[in-house]
A protein has these predicted regions:
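Cytosolic C-terminal regulatory domains/tails of membrane transporters and channels
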Residues: 437-558
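Transmembrane helical cores of multi-pass secondary ion antiporters/exchangers
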Residues: 1-446, 461, 469, 526-558
């Protein structure tokens, strides 16, 4: 691989990303189109990137960043649709593609066709999530799409491994595919949790934001490669390592949290731009590979069109089946509640228990609405895993023969990836606007109000403690001023100045104590399950910025 060419591609992709965002366009689609056009410039060489680079270097940080910002609470809350879309749909898509491709292409074995299905099965939620955030999709839809993207890669790559080993005759830990699938999932998750816990312990001893951030950068790569060495799922190892670190992320200092947020945001922009640029640059050469393999180019891309339509059809059918199942379950739940006094009493007792514990009411059997199902069904753009898996197909089998259908699979994979990006990625924003999904602002306000109650209670405890035993240097008027700021949720604390240097230093120390008490109280309630994780995450980030401002002011006085 030419390092200079790689840097040129990265710089060009970043430039196109900046231009697309300035014009209000989707960067992914524009980068692919520009890359495809650039590939026809005379003298532009093929960007030779190994599958190991994409799977081992590009994929882990993208997954880790997404999982780090997606708490285990949100994952478990939407577990049923996430597993349905991330596992069941991947398997169904792979099998459907396998049967259709083997029926269309003469001489294409079913195993090779299912390998093609495993390659094109997993959607990439990067583009969908970016569009959804911009247009304000309901939080539940965003959580389902994000959670699906964390699981489906593992399912697809495990299927890919099983199919490749069956065709190429390579060794796998278990001959039984079900056992191999279970082993990969369980061991991968355990590796991720173990490394995440170890990282949390190390971070407590480091006590330096720079070192803690470096450790965080190393973690996804370590999790991926260690799990892969154990023939487990590196994808799940990365995801569960992120869950473990994210769950304890508030035990580190505010500097580490703020620094890591910017670092992972930069990783996301850089790696996503590279993947889509690589996709566009490779298109012309994929056509050449098909011709070199002496395959009819028209037939190959006709097959690509059929598979593209198939994957775009299977997803809506499955999503609507999930919707129908949820609606039937809700109807059965309502019928049981209306017809059984004992069942109603049990629900009422559970509601009283949750209320006494300060927990929000449980929302039973709330399936996706029809507009939400439409959005989820259309958010099926393929991306990094499809491209990486296609490139990872070996050149030959263990007997030395050429791997059957390699050029065909790669061509169809690129066709599906680019096709879904152009068709679904380009039309998804208009679809969301037209559906006019109801905003979940009311729910967010309710969750924010619960968080505010906890913050005010924590502020009251701190103020009461300072009032009963004021620190030296605190005048009565300063204590009253501090009480007023605490009532305002410390919103103005970062800008507040004391009347003189000594008083100001003491005053800022009180503000730091207040901010930390608020953070600890909110996190304690979140861990009890009484607060919405999204509302808590938003508040924690704001408290971090406020603490950074106050701490910086204190340091400037030294």
């Amino acid at each position: 691989m030419d390092i200079v060419l790689l840097f040129v591609v990265l710089l060009g992709a970043i430039g196109v990303t900046a231009l697309a965002k300035r014009k209000g366009l989707q960067p992914a689609l524009i980068i692919v189109v520009v890359g495809f056009g650039v590939s026809f410039i005379p003298g532009v060489p093929r960007l030779a990137v190994s599958s190991e680079l994409i799977l081992g270097v590009v994929l882990p940080p993208l997954l880790y960043s997404a999982a780090l910002n997606f708490s285990m609470f949100r994952f478990l809350r939407n577990l049923r649709p996430i597993l349905g879309l991330g596992v069941s749909l991947v398997i169904i898509t792979a099998i459907a593609v396998g049967f259709v491709a083997s029926a269309i292409v003469p001489g294409l074995a079913l195993g090779t066709a299912i390998l093609l299905g495993a390659v094109v099965a997993p959607p990439d939620a990067v583009t969908a999530a970016a569009i959804g955030n911009k247009l304000g999709l309901p939080r539940r839809v965003m959580d389902i799409l994000t959670g699906e993207s964390l699981v489906n890669d593992a399912a697809a790559l495990t299927l890919f491994t099983i199919a490749v080993s069956a065709i190429a005759g390579t060794h796998t830990l278990f001959a039984n595919p079900v056992l191999l699938f279970a082993y990969a999932a369980i061991v991968g998750a355990l590796v991720g949790v173990a490394l995440g816990v170890m990282a949390n312990i190390l971070r407590r001893f480091l006590g330096n934001a720079g070192l803690e951030t470096v450790l965080g950068i190393m973690l996804p790569f370590a999790a991926y490669f260690i799990a892969e060495q154990l023939e487990a799922s590196g994808v799940l190892a990365v995801v569960f390592a992120a869950f473990a670190v994210g769950g304890a992320n508030n035990s580190v200092g505010y500097q580490t949290r703020l620094q890591e947020k910017q670092v992972w945001s930069s990783f996301d922009v850089l790696l996503e731009a590279f993947v889509f640029a690589y996709m566009g640059l490779q298109l012309r050469f994929v056509v050449g590979d098909v011709a070199e393999a002496k395959l009819p180019v028209g037939l190959v891309f006709a097959l690509g069109g059929v598979i593209l339509l198939l994957v775009m059809l299977v997803r809506p059918v499955f999503v609507y089946a999930l919707y129908a199942q949820g609606a039937l379950q809700k109807r059965g739940f309502e019928k049981r509640r209306a017809g059984s006094k004992r069942f109603r009493q049990r629900l009422e007792r559970a509601a009283v228990t949750r209320r006494n514990r300060g927990r929000p009411p449980r929302r039973d059997f709330e399936p996706m609405t029809v507009p939400e199902a439409v959005v989820v069904s259309w958010a099926g753009m393929r991306g990094v895993v499809t491209i990486a898996a296609a490139a990872a197909i070996p050149l030959s089998t263990t007997t030395g023969e050429a791997f059957p259908g390699r050029a065909l699979i790669q061509a169809v994979a690129f066709t599906v990836a680019v096709g879904t990006l152009i068709i679904q990625g380009a039309t998804l924003p208009a679809l969301i606007r037209r559906l006019r999904l109801p905003s979940d602002d009311a729910t967010r306000r309710e969750n924010d109000a619960r968080v505010l109650e906890v913050v005010r209670a924590a502020s009251g405890r701190v103020v009461a403690e300072f009032t009963s035993s004021p620190p030296p240097g605190i005048a009565p008027e300063m204590l009253e001023q501090f009480r007023m700021i605490a009532e305002q949720r410390t919103k103005a604390a970062a800008r507040q100045e004391g009347p003189d240097l000594e008083g100001s230093a003491v005053f800022d120390t009180l503000l730091l104590t207040l901010l930390r008490a608020q953070r600890e109280a909110v996190l304690a309630e979140r861990n009890r399950g009484t607060l919405d994780p999204n509302a808590v995450d938003t508040l924690i980030e704001r408290l971090d910025y406020q603490e950074a401002a106050v701490a910086s002011r204190i340091e400037n006085r030294l």
